[in-house]
């Protein structure tokens, strides 16, 4: 008799995606982060739902409702910090996942790569709106500063900002709509994830060698289910260490002060996962130029497949490209550090240098080095 998982309409889809899926036999732990991102999304949706049960999206009570969750709701503080630090884990896995795609040439699967970029943008938008909801000082001023960037758009900028705000400043209307979008977007992300997987399973996964693996496949279960489970346990260990021992390590102390439109915090800065883009934004003295650089810093991922000049797909056997990749990683770490520093000498100069290096590496240096490697290998 045929196993039910192979004939039942719903189970068949699950079976072909997670059980009998033919997977390359040599994919390393860098391929674990896709499943970890799925786990992060599940954690965020579940904890977010329980937070939404107790939260009120009103300027007068938002801060108090978050305080009430932490003080009075049974295990409320755990749920709140799981959600806040879960976002950090989400972005950590996202950055590693994208980095792995760049290193091993996964961008040669264009549909999967482009859906991934749309997912990155959507997750960033969701996280930004979520940061506004506790209605602390950094929530309010972060929302004001970031939404105000749209006023740099010629002609329609000011009208657009007021339309997003729902008034002439960040207020009750802004908070209500941000809560509505923050609630609905994770479900849109879940739908995009399914499309991402659909396109991935059309072609099959890439592997560390970057070569065709049709001749050497193994079933996803039990080999990679066990491997993913180990990754999940390590992720949960890191997340629970943060939640139970250092819950405020990645947060901002200013967000424990209720939002006050009359008092600007000394240093307005976003969460750590946006600091690299914030540093690029601040490195350009012109407002419109800064906004364009900010958007381009993420959108540049879309043209990476066109900038791929190497004859080999993966960087596994390309030591010069590897060095450039790790310089890019170090540069992004530098930008993240600079984003959290005040706008003064020498941080301005370091930020500008790191921003120029970021764009130069992706647009000029890495493609040129790849061409050099082709010559060296006589390809």
Curated annotation (Swiss-Prot):
Topological type in the membrane: Multi-pass membrane protein
Source organism (scientific name):
Allocebus trichotis
Q: Which cysteines are joined by disulfide bonds?
A: none
Know the name of this protein?
A: Cytochrome b
Its gene?
MT-CYB
Q: Spell out the CDD domains in the cross-references.
A: cytochrome_b_C, Cytochrome_b_N
Obligatory cofactor(s): heme b
Extra facts: Heme 1 (or BL or b562) is low-potential and absorbs at about 562 nm, and heme 2 (or BH or b566) is high-potential and absorbs at about 566 nm.
Q: Name one GO molecular function term.
A: metal ion binding
